[in-house]
Amino acid sequence: MESKEHKGLSRRALFSATAGSAILAGTVGPAALSLGAAGLATPARAATGADGSVAPGKLDDYYGFWSSGQTGEMRILGIPSMRELMRVPVFNRCSATGWGQTNESIRIHQRTMTEKTKKQLAANGKKIHDNGDLHHVHMSFTDGKYDGRYLFMNDKANTRVARVRCDVMKTDAILEIPNAKGIHGMRPQKWPRSNYVFCNGEDEAPLVNDGSTMTDVATYVNIFTAVDADKWEVAWQVKVSGNLDNCDADYEGKWAFSTSYNSEMGMTLEEMTKSEMDHVVVFNIAEIEKAIKAGQYEEINGVKVVDGRKEAKSLFTRYIPIANNPHGCNMAPDRKHLCVAGKLSPTVTVLDVTKFDALFYDNAEPRSAVVAEPELGLGPLHTAFDGRGNAYTSLFLDSQVVKWNIDEAIRAYAGEKINPIKDKLDVQYQPGHLKTVMGETLDAANDWLVCLCKFSKDRFLNVGPLKPENDQLIDISGDKMVLVHDGPTFAEPHDAIAVSPSILPNIRSVWDRKDPLWAETRKQAEADEVDIDEWTEAVIRDGNKVRVYMTSVAPSFSQPSFTVKEGDEVTVIVTNLDEIDDLTHGFTMGNHGVAMEVGPQQTSSVTFVAANPGVYWYYCQWFCHALHMEMRGRMFVEPKGA
């Protein structure tokens, strides 16, 4: 392997640096202080160009689907206006909609929950997690292009992934992934369609995590997971060497790839940054599928697992050395090149995926797949692409976005005297993910780039110690990038995608009465001989369990009142029979911590205990009618023994 001087940050620099201060001379490698490739383009001050505004009553050109990090929800924005259009609760408990409290949402949370998780939650008085750390949102693909069926997202906090239906923009499935810990990187298969969603386990732990070997790091392992995107269950898993960070997939359906910043399997920051080189893991999908089909796997916690660690010398994986603590892993729309950001190295490594067959079947030297390694600046994290062969990489430490040309970087790596860097733009501040419109598909556009900055500092009015993030809109239609908008966002978007509305023609404004979301609720109603598709006001008592069926048509509930006994478990089932767009109802039970959304033609239900005797008003918390305030009724709770 070619020997190259390591030009990243020293370990001392890493420990002494803070995100809020620049890393100056003496704390960076010599490349950053020389007139190397990274220094040839003069950074431009962020300038104001076309403002990207959308007039009242006009629609945005694109949907933006945002993660929210520790808030646990998905957000929908309009691009270029950057107006927030909707929040879709996923892993979080949502007070507005009742997500995480309605019976329908609890079933989705619990469907794949492990017994260990149920035990942990029960010990803390819970049925489900009420938090999540949602980093990445990606859409399903067909033939390398978005197909508008599903959106997928991860939960790093509780080792889960979720699926949102694009026709109603509601979560329809959550999967807890066994054996792995801390699902971070997550990408759908691009070709021929998203049969799989690939998920990276970031955190190291024993596979048999029962406390018997918890101090023996030699028993720790990381897991790469393929989730069946249609069945929403684990298809197979691969043991790997090192940990897993971000991932992506190719445009032929042959490969998936993941970065690893902890090839050392270190347990401390110093140990994790010790090596000059880490790696990218390449997964051979066909070989893994062949082994699974032939029964050549071990079953661990009900999952089929193959061994792709280095010492296994299998055809499942190959490891390509990359400097240093690599992070972003982004496949270009040219179908050929994978860009891996160095994070602690000022470089992005460009891999030619057409050379991967030789790594597996011809014993080619791992770095033979490297075709470019441009020096771009300090702290490269992620790369986005336009449709003209250009790449855009975020530089966390430099607080910049750098535009560079992939073909010219390859020519420079081969020895040609050419500078692939086309432009640099200051952003505010410390950028992480960035995305062009449709840039992770074969339909990459050339108009807008969104850069998600981790710090806003002085860009907005001071709102206290916790500041908003800053999502910046950048015009990339010309030769130079132009900053056109600052967008404050609540904690903490990590990633986003931008999608043409033409891909989403089937978004509904009114629910289908046969929707599977409330199928189990309908089954219970049928057992109770209640028709929830018609006006109903039934009350069913089953011991100390009471089911109250009611219909809502603005501005009234079919049940002006109902009576239960102290200590009863009460389930209220509400069906909104209005068929008008945007006529959402709600049901809130006063002084019981109960509230839920009931969209037009939707059925929703919620269960609670009526613990105290007395009169309690329920009401519609959505403003659905001029007589909205009058849309209410009483629950009478009779004292025990009355």
Swiss-Prot record:
Pfam families: nos_propeller, nos_propeller_2
Residue numbers spanned by region COX2-like: 544-642
Segments passing through the bilayer: none
Reaction(s) catalysed (UniProt annotation): N2 + 2 Fe(III)-[cytochrome c] + H2O = nitrous oxide + 2 Fe(II)-[cytochrome c] + 2 H(+)
Main location: periplasm
Residues of the signal peptide: 1-46
Key words, A-Z: Calcium, Copper, Metal-binding, Oxidoreductase, Periplasm, Signal
GO biological process, one term: denitrification pathway
Entry binding sites for Cu cation Z4: H494
Binding site for Cu cation Z2: H135, H184
Binding site for Cu cation A1: H585, C620, C624, M631
Binding site for Cu cation Z3: H136, H433
Cofactor: Ca(2+); Cu cation
Binding positions (Ca(2+) 2): Y261, E264, M272, D278, N325
GO cellular component: membrane; periplasmic space
PTM (free text): Predicted to be exported by the Tat system. The position of the signal peptide cleavage has been experimentally proven.
Localization, UniProt: Periplasm
Pathway entry: Nitrogen metabolism; nitrate reduction (denitrification); dinitrogen from nitrate: step 4/4
Enzyme Commission number(s) of this protein: 1.7.2.4
Binding annotation for Cu cation Z1: H327, H382
Binding site for Ca(2+) 1: K454, E469
Function: Nitrous-oxide reductase is part of a bacterial respiratory system which is activated under anaerobic conditions in the presence of nitrate or nitrous oxide.
NCBIfam families in UniProt: nitrous_NosZ_RR
Subunit comment: Homodimer.
HAMAP family the UniProt entry points to: NosZ
Descriptive protein name: Nitrous-oxide reductase
Lineage, opening ranks: Bacteria, Pseudomonadati, Pseudomonadota, Betaproteobacteria, Burkholderiales
GN (gene name): nosZ
